């Protein structure tokens, strides 16, 4: 959120600052520089993912089977405890 606020503020600043001249060039230059400066921080933040953050099709099916087994075990344990 702060990144978008910063980019918006810089865009408005660049348009106001260079209003008399060709402001599009300065606007694009500032946005490009901010993107180059901020992109390594965004990329390094996203590299700390684990296997659970990126589930594959196989991992999803295994997790679903495990949840079903746990639910069935809970039902069976409830039924056997009431018989005893």
Swiss-Prot record:
Main location: host cell
Function in brief: Plays an essential role in budded virion (BV) and occluded derived virion (ODV) development. Participates in intranuclear microvesicle formation, ODV envelopment, and subsequent embedding of virions into occlusion bodies.
Protein name, per record: Protein Ac76
Superkingdom: Viruses
Keyword terms of this UniProt record: Host cytoplasm, Host nucleus
Species the sequence originates in: Autographa californica nuclear polyhedrosis virus
GO cellular component terms listed in the entry, alphabetical order: host cell cytoplasm; host cell nuclear membrane
Localization: Host cytoplasm; Host nucleus
Subunit structure and binding partners: Interacts with protein Ac75.
Entry annotated with the keyword Mitochondrion: no
Any Pfam family hit: Ac76
Statement: the UniProt record of this protein carries the keyword Nucleotidyltransferase: no
Disulfide bonds: none
InterPro entries from the UniProt entry: Ac76_baculovir (IPR008561)
């Amino acid at each position: 959120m702060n990144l978008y606020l910063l980019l918006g503020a810089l865009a408005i600043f660049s348009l106001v600052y260079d209003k008399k001249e060709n402001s599009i060039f300065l606007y694009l230059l500032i946005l490009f520089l901010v993107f180059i400066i901020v992109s390594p921080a965004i990329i390094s933040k996203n590299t700390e993912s684990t296997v659970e953050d990126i589930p594959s099709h196989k991992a999803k099916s295994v997790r679903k089977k495990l949840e079903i087994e746990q639910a069935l075990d809970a039902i069976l344990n409830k039924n056997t405890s009431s018989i005893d």
